Amino acid sequence: MTAESAPPPPPQPETLAAVKEERGEAAAAGAGVPAEAAGRGAGGRRRKRPLQRGKPPYSYIALIAMAIAHAPERRLTLGGIYKFITERFPFYRDNPKKWQNSIRHNLTLNDCFLKIPREAGRPGKGNYWALDPNAEDMFESGSFLRRRKRFKRSDLSTYPAYMHDAAAAAAAAAAAIFPGAVPAARPAYPGAVYAGYAPPLAAPPPVYYPAASPGPCRVFGLVPERPLSPDLGPAPSAAGGSCAFAAAAGAAGTGSFQPAVCTGARPVNPAAYAAAYAGPDGAYPQGASSALFAAAAGRLAGPASPPAGGGSGGVEATVDFYGRTSPGQFGAALGPCYNPGGQLGAGGGGAYHSRHATAYPGAVDRFVSAM
């Protein structure tokens, strides 16, 4: 192998760099681009977006705060904020309207701005925007060049001038949907929007049943819809689990009563119920006279006067305060079914069935066994 056929030596690095630079200059000259710009674009990083000429050095939050601070009422609509910015800074007037989206986003996403609903009689449309009173010191000494810190509202209850009462609004909304289901303890909404709603109904008084007293007997009838007479009082229970029924006084003001005691056996599965006529403190009301009140009967039936000896033929006259015929008037014919007091079953007293009292408190006895 001779020296003439040997491969040429590799070029030096300086020679390669010079060749590349010459080629880049030739390409830039052909395209009309300066060589300095071509070299910076090829080897350097991407340039940042150039600053727009004439753009004010204020953030969008600062622009909004300036507009609200210059308003006579210290509040502006969205259109009023746009107008202030375009009149004060020509940059936003001549450029596209993309900045308006940023204004809207900053209004809704920052806690330092409060939305105030427009009054009913005020013309125009749109809500008002105001600066939170606790956020007025966000900018140092009135300078809006830079925000000092992000404002975060922690307690909404400290701004009663701008925030509605959530509880009252919820009560008014519930009254609109269910007019009779508003609790009595919650007052009506004082605002003009909900002024047409009726005041809430009074809640029923609590029911109280002494554990030591025997339960009420099973009765034939429904809970009366008429109010009870104010002259009725509580009926004392007889010993041994017997039932005491109401009896009307023979004469007004006599204060006497004649309890009738159940003597037969009670049904096997009594579905007793209790008619709730309790006072505010949970006890049964005490009337002016001593006439008895049958607590669980739901209707009143009792002997108006002592039975005449043999004159009535075994039929006992009863008093029904609700204009209905009591089964007690047919005691002779329905001897095994009804007792003289007008109650279903000839049974005597027994313990109150706790399971039915728990499952059906204050309900009507709908489970009457077939005769």
From Swiss-Prot:
Q: Which GO terms describe its cellular component?
A: nucleus
Write the record's keywords in alphabetical order, separated by commas: DNA-binding, Nucleus, Phosphoprotein, Transcription, Transcription regulation
**Gene disruption phenotype:** Knockout mice die before hair formation. They exhibit cleft palate and either a sublingual or completely absent thyroid gland and show neonatal hypothyroidism.
> What post-translational changes are documented for it?
Phosphorylated.
Query: A single GO BP annotation from the record?
Result: chordate pharynx development
Q: Name one Pfam family in it.
A: Forkhead
Q: Which SUPFAM superfamilies does the protein's record reference?
A: Winged helix' DNA-binding domain (SSF46785)
The function of this protein is: Transcription factor that binds consensus sites on a variety of gene promoters and activate their transcription. Involved in proper palate formation, most probably through the expression of MSX1 and TGFB3 genes which are direct targets of this transcription factor. Also implicated in thyroid gland morphogenesis. May indirectly play a role in cell growth and migration through the regulation of WNT5A expression.
Question: Could you tell me what this protein is called?
Answer: Forkhead box protein E1
Protein species of origin: Mus musculus
Traced from the root, the source organism's taxonomic lineage reads:
Eukaryota, Metazoa, Chordata, Craniata, Vertebrata
